[in-house]
UniProtKB/Swiss-Prot annotation:
Its main location: membrane. It is found in: Cell inner membrane. It comes from Geobacter metallireducens (strain ATCC 53774 / DSM 7210 / GS-15). Keywords: Cell inner membrane, Cell membrane, Ion channel, Ion transport, Membrane, Metal-binding, Sodium, Transmembrane, Transmembrane helix, Transport. One of its GO terms (cellular component) is plasma membrane. It catalyses: fluoride(in) = fluoride(out). Na(+) is not transported, but it plays an essential structural role and its presence is essential for fluoride channel function. This is Fluoride-specific ion channel FluC.
Length: 124
């Protein structure tokens, strides 16, 4: 039961964090490219690498907290569905290069940030 509560509470916090962070990014750089979605996904990629690697190397993060942080918070923070929708809209609008850049940037930068999170955790 504690795990379910952790997922729900951290999930709510992750959703709020996504809304606030993406909104701040869009307010700062505009909406010509899906920077807000890219930002939350990149942050989430780094954090999942950090949290998972750290939890594999130590017992400092209880299982309920790890699940709450990864499935709950990061599940609420990151968004593959919004990434998919925004990319589809770019394609529909004929913005083929922008759509391709979005896909490549999302995949490559997120993978790099996951690796960076893992490397960071290994040096803690």
């Amino acid at each position: 039961m504690l795990t379910i509560v952790a997922i729900a509470l951290f999930g709510a916090l992750g959703c709020l964090a996504r809304y606030l962070l993406a909104g701040w990014v869009y307010a700062f750089v505009g909406r010509g490219f899906p920077y807000g979605t890219l930002t939350v996904n990149v942050v989430g990629a780094f954090l999942i690498g950090l949290i998972m690697e750290f939890s594999l190397r130590t017992t400092l993060i209880p299982q309920e907290l790890r699940i709450g942080l990864t499935i709950g918070f990061l599940g609420g923070l990151t968004t593959f569905s919004t990434f998919s929708y925004e990319t589809f809209r770019l394609l529909e609008d004929g913005e083929f290069i922008t759509a391709a850049v979005n896909v490549l940037a999302s995949v490559l930068v997120c993978l790099a940030c996951t690796w960076l999170g893992i490397m960071t955790a290994r040096h803690l």
